[in-house]
Amino acid sequence: MTSIDINNLQNTFQQAMNMSGSPGAVCTSPTQSFMNTVPQRLNAVKHPKILKPFSTGDMKILLLENVNQTAITIFEEQGYQVEFYKSSLPEEELIEKIKDVHAIGIRSKTRLTSNVLQHAKNLVCIGCFCIGTNQVDLDYATSRGIAVFNSPFSNSRSVAELVIAEIISLARQLGDRSIELHTGTWNKVAARCWEVRGKTLGIIGYGHIGSQLSVLAEAMGLHVLYYDIVTIMALGTARQVSTLDELLNKSDFVTLHVPATPETEKMLSAPQFAAMKDGAYVINASRGTVVDIPSLIQAVKANKIAGAALDVYPHEPAKNGEGSFNDELNSWTSELVSLPNIILTPHIGGSTEEAQSSIGIEVATALSKYINEGNSVGSVNFPEVALKSLSYDQENTVRVLYIHQNVPGVLKTVNDILSNHNIEKQFSDSNGEIAYLMADISSVDQSDIKDIYEQLNQTSAKISIRLLY
């Protein structure tokens, strides 16, 4: 703790009070007796104890797909060994690289299948530096006791802004006019070009992105309807509708913000396009499986749909490159790109400097907390379990992290093993077939740690164990 100049601190406090007070307000500085206690108060703050794992070497992190530098900085500050690649890896190389790492960070192109994950003998957690987690075999990861984290918040604004840009671009046919002028054609027209003020935006999925989009759209004068499978409080004057058909019938623009699940696959197909207003527009910046693109193509050709903006596709190129978005990837590509007023972008919804920086911080922080403290808050496949950080004055305290099958009798078995020590705190929760127990036990020495580890390792319901001290 650095020394503190009490006089400077007192003067700074007085200046801050004077600047923040209203005209004529009377402010008094802290008493000298209070200021004299400041160093003692600051020194009394209990800083979180940096824990280390038992029976594990240095933590190794593998980062793929050009994960943001903010994540690398956070991991290196923790003392982890970081291996970084700008692109995804071929499966054979990925299998080789993943064998001895404790955590891996990916974006949307890397596929962590059961075939890959079965070779990851030391893997503790996975960080998806994006919203989606469908590129990870979550069931297999869970069965192995591997926690998976994502970034549900950080790119929400960037995606919402892209959709706003696409709404205006579709309404004014900006994509077509730009292409024409790039090829030397001057085509100044007003036919079928509209202001967005007074039009109705229908949002399918009113989560982090959908709700932010709602606020931005209303600020531009759009009326907002939204459909969600759960009842969600509206922001502003937006209104929730009870059925998807009602939203489709009433909306001039329809935008999707839903995850890729069996229930959302092709949720906009021929019947839904038929239910939409004549001349409506479709925007998909969520997942490539939620819109049936061949049906969309037919609806555009029939002049039922006046235009569409797509940022995601059922199959996407593994890396950047000319000619990679073609009919071999998706059989309808040539037909789609030939249509008028179709805006196609290469999955860039969250591709802003701000979003990637925030995602790096959000996911790297979650992974670090899980590695260092066992905190699983924010995991997409684990129960959310957390205990207060240990402090440095808890010298002989060990944190037990026990991931196990969700079957009867486990807590009794574990507590019998821990009963010779003082269990200071304990938290257990379950999620489907997996359960997670976290316990802080005191009065433990090095020989006790080894004995506890070996006993827990022999329990029949054990999936994985970590002891932090």
Curated annotation (Swiss-Prot):
Residues that bear Phosphoserine: S22, S29, S33
| Biological processes, Gene Ontology terms | L-serine biosynthetic process
Is Amino-acid biosynthesis one of the keywords UniProt gives this record? yes
Task: List, alphabetically, the CDD domains matched.
Answer: ACT_3PGDH, PGDH_3
Q: What residues sit in the active site?
A: R287, E316, H347
**Family named by the database record:** Belongs to the D-isomer specific 2-hydroxyacid dehydrogenase family.
Q: What is this protein called in UniProt?
A: D-3-phosphoglycerate dehydrogenase 1
